[in-house]
Each structure stands twice: as C-alpha cells, then as structure tokens.
C-alpha cells in the first residue's frame, strides 16, 4: 500500500467512514434529510464507476464508553452500540436503493441473517467489483474496538486505496476549532504526527493500524455538499494523513 495521495483521476476503491452522530443531525435517532443527502453524494461517485465500501458508527443511538460512565458494563454497552450501527446501515441502504437504484449489501460482523450478510472479505470485494455498495455494520463484532478501527481494518482487508473519514469539520486542526478559534488546518500530516500531537481525529488504534500499513486517511467535511465526490476525485480538500513509503514519518 502506498499513500502519497490519489493517482491521476482519483481513487477507484474507497472506504468511507461516517460518524453515527451525523446521521442523527445532532439528536438521538436518524435524520432522513441527512441520510438522504449522504446517499445522494454516494450515488454520484458510484455512477462514475468508483467502488465504495462504508463503515457507519452508532453514536446517534449509543456509545459504549458513555454508557460505562453511567455504570453499565463496557462490553454490554459496546454490543448495544453495534446494534445501533446496523440500524444506520439499513437506513442508508434503503435510501441508496429506493431513491437512487444503487445495488447495496449490508454485511455485519455479528450474524443477523434476516437483515444482512455475514462479513466475508472476499465476498465483500466481489460485491464491489460488481458495482455494489457494501455497508459494514456491527463494528468488528468485538467490544472495546471503535468503528474508526473497523474502518481501518476493513479498508486494508478488502484492498481499498484510502479511508475517507467524513467529519463535521474541514479536516485536522492544531486544536479543536470549535473551542479554539485560532486553530489552523493541516493540509497534510503524517500518522505519527497525529499520534504524537494527540490530535483527536480518530482513535489511536485506527491511526496506528493505518500507519503500520501505509493506508492514507483523508479527513474532510461531510456537511459541504459535493465533498464526497471531491475527495474521491483527488481534489485538495480537508487533510491528507499519510506515511512515506519508507516508513519514516
């Protein structure tokens, strides 16, 4: 895997990571307007022949770490959050198929035979080769692992060129721009720098996994219309997080 950015013409196989809290539009549950907007942007890139896999979080329903703070066993809270991710997956699948005619498969790390296929890497890759969008639910199927880590692992296993990490901000900043107005945006940064600076873009496990395997991460603002197509097309938006091929950060 090389990670100096997209080849001419953009990326051809991508893993799109969507935060669950964005699906809720800032509240608990699913906001149909948000899901519809995301589905429309995904349909645009699929129409251009890009192979797309998606990992969705469940933060609009549950967060295991937050439930733990209220006294719940962490593992049980994480399993509840996994179920929340599947609800988000099914919602996105519905919008993609019903409104845009995009053939879609939901694959889960926990067996849910009536609503999704089990996650089998080679089958997922084959679906993508046939032009189907693959949506991964239930995280890794194990507690204590975030959906950011799931995105990194799935991207590596099915041969994606990049993890497109959609956020509610424009990219990676020197500090949280919501609390520090003077924070500045990085156009590029290495995985190691993100970890050493303690920048809260995604969890450290996900970044370490991508760093060790030279998987680039493009962090961009999902709330800007057309940004998914811009990210896939290789336009300079957001922040490209990468590690030189030599492995020296």
Swiss-Prot record:
Subcellular location: Cytoplasm
The organism's place on the tree of life at top rank: Bacteria
GO cellular component, one term: cytoplasm
Positions of ATP binding: 17-20, 59, 63, 173, 176
InterPro entries tied to this protein: AceGlu_kinase-like_sf, Asp/Glu/Uridylate_kinase, Uridylate_kinase, Uridylate_kinase_bac
Pathway involvement of the protein, from the record: Pyrimidine metabolism; CTP biosynthesis via de novo pathway; UDP from UMP (UMPK route): step 1/1
Entry keyword set: ATP-binding, Cytoplasm, Kinase, Nucleotide-binding, Pyrimidine biosynthesis, Transferase
Activity regulation annotation text: Inhibited by UTP.
Group of enzyme by EC: transferase
Subunit-level organization: Homohexamer.
UniProt-listed NCBIfam families: pyrH_bact (TIGR02075)
Function: Catalyzes the reversible phosphorylation of UMP to UDP.
UniProt family annotation: Belongs to the UMP kinase family.
Name this protein carries in UniProt: Uridylate kinase
Gene: pyrH
């Amino acid at each position: 895997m090389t990670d100096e950015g997209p080849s001419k013409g953009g990326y051809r196989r991508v893993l799109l990571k969507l935060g669950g809290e964005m699906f809720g539009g800032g509240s608990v549950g699913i906001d149909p307007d948000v899901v519809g907007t995301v589905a429309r942007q995904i349909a645009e890139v699929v129409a251009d022949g890009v192979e797309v896999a998606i990992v969705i979080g469940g933060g609009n329903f549950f967060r295991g770490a937050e439930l733990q703070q209220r006294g719940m066993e962490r593992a049980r809270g994480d399993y509840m959050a996994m179920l929340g991710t599947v609800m988000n997956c099914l919602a996105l699948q519905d919008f993609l198929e019903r409104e845009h005619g995009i053939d879609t498969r939901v694959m889960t790390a926990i067996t849910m035979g009536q609503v999704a296929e089990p996650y089998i890497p080679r089958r997922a890759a084959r679906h993508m080769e046939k032009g189907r969008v693959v949506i991964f639910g239930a995280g890794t199927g194990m507690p204590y692992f975030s959906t950011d880590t799931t995105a990194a692992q799935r991207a590596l296993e099915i041969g994606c060129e990049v993890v497109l990490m959609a956020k509610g901000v424009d990219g990676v900043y020197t500090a949280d721009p919501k609390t520090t107005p003077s924070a500045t945006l990085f156009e590029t940064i290495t995985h190691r720098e993100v970890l050493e600076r303690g920048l809260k873009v995604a969890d450290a496990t996900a970044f370490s996994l991508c760093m060790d395997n030279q998987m680039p991460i493009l962090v961009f603002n999902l709330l800007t219309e057309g940004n998914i197509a811009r990210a896939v097309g290789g336009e300079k938006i957001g922040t490209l997080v990468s590690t030189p091929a030599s492995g020296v950060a």
